[in-house]
Regions:
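Extracytoplasmic "Venus flytrap"
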Residues: 22-43, 68-74, 96-99, 163-171, ...
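Beta-alpha junction/loop-to-helix N-cap segments that form part of ligand/metal-binding clefts
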Residues: 14, 33-37, 52-127, 136, ...
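Segments of small-molecule ligand-sensing domains
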Residues: 287-300, 309-366
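Short, low-complexity disordered leader/linker segments with a strong preference
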Residues: 1-20, 56-57, 86, 370-371
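Extracytoplasmic ligand/sensor domains, especially the bilobed periplasmic-binding protein
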Residues: 89-192, 240-266
């Protein structure tokens, strides 16, 4: 009977639906402080969304965060990705490092699950032809190039040494830095390599010292950059020290200690908050500290925006089905904490800005925003 059918249909329609969003980052290992910062950004976004009483396709939606640890290790990263696919997440925010993001992106692509990385900057990530890959930061071609030109034009670097940690991120940003230096007419006098687990840099630094560089660039993360700076001091290498976003953290202040110096370290972070967004970012940082009990370390605002952008696409599509909301994500225009967010046809953020920083009196100080 019609009544029986109506009852059966009503029985199938859940009063509200639970939607799972995945997050992956290094929650253990030497850069766990950055992974946990990212995870906190995701937690805050999910909490905000659940307070907002969102309805999609006529049902109230409750969002759940499924968080995985990739230990900044590519193998662990692909295992975490598979776990999230098996858990039926509708989207993933992550990973933090390019070296984990790139191999995992194939798994999400095969499963048709949208992935937004808050922080993977290696250009290759969005050059694989996957429809599911997005990022909310400028890539290394922009970041490394800007730093390379800055080393020559502003810091007046005549002889520049380059070290990288051989990861997808570190090597990628160092390669782009070298291109930037050469484009500005500068000279790279030495190129050395380490790993992202190394603690002793004496032999490569001794080799570099012989070349008398006035600028040393390091492609890698703060956990290696800090001790490297201290060992440069021990060897009396008085060069300026430069790096990408991986070293551009609050943690570097502790890790480098006295070797940080004043206006000695120069780094850039993808993203740059200009004009009207400055207040928005300041408010976010204050609220983050209150809610999460810690200062923003680096990428938590990007993670927060990535979650919000993903859910905005679901709202526009009136569906949490990845197949249905993915086309909306590709053409989204969203006003985030970090600024306006829209993607090009590869999934790179359009018009990404950069901020250059230095450190003075044990504090990080913004020098300028480059658009």
């Amino acid at each position: 009977s019609a009544a029986a059918i109506a009852v059966a249909v009503a029985g199938c329609a859940p009063k509200d639906s639970t939607v799972k969003i995945g997050h992956v980052g290094p929650l253990t290992g030497s850069i766990a402080h950055l992974g946990k910062d990212n995870e906190s950004g995701a937690k805050l976004a999910i909490a905000d969304l659940n307070k907002a009483d969102i309805k999609i396709d006529g049902k109230k939606v409750t969002f759940t965060l499924i968080s995985e640890d990739d230990g900044a290790d590519p193998k662990q990263g692909t295992a975490a990705a598979q776990k999230l696919v098996d858990a039926k997440v509708v989207g993933v925010i992550g990973h933090l490092n390019s070296g984990t993001t790139i191999p995992a992106s194939k798994i999400y692509s095969d499963a048709g699950i949208p992935q937004i990385s808050p922080s993977a900057t290696n250009p290759k990530y969005t050059q694989q032809g996957f429809k599911t890959t997005f990022r909310v930061v400028a890539n290394d071609a922009t970041l490394g190039g800007v730093l390379g030109k800055y080393a020559v034009n502003e810091l007046k670097g005549k002889s520049i040494a380059v070290i990288d940690d051989r990861t997808a991120y570190g090597q990628g940003v160092a390669d782009e830095f070298v291109k930037g230096v050469e484009a500005a007419g500068g000279k790279v006098v030495d190129r050395q390599f380490t790993t992202d687990k190394a603690t002793d840099f004496m032999s490569i630094l001794t080799a570099i010292r012989a070349k008398k560089p006035d600028v040393v660039f390091f492609g890698g993360m703060d956990a290696v950059g800090g001790p490297m700076l201290r060992q440069m001091d021990q060897l009396k290498i008085n060069a300026k020290f430069m790096g990408g976003d991986g070293i551009c953290t609050g943690e570097l202040i502790k890790l480098a200690d006295k070797a940080l110096g004043n206006s000695r370290v120069f780094c850039a972070e993808a993203g740059g908050v200009v004009g009207p967004y400055e207040k928005k970012m300041a408010d976010f940082k204050e609220r983050f500290k209150k809610e999460m009990g810690a200062d923003v370390n680096l990428y938590s605002p990007y993670v927060y925006d990535a979650v919000m952008v993903m859910v905005e696409a679901m709202k526009k599509a009136n569906s949490t089905d990845p197949k249905k909301y993915l086309p909306e994500l590709a053409k989204i225009q969203y006003d985030g904490v970090i600024g306006p967010i829209a993607f090009d046809d590869k999934g790179d953020i359009k018009g990404g800005t950069l901020t250059l920083f230095t450190y003075k009196d044990g504090k990080r100080e913004a020098l300028k925003v480059i658009q």
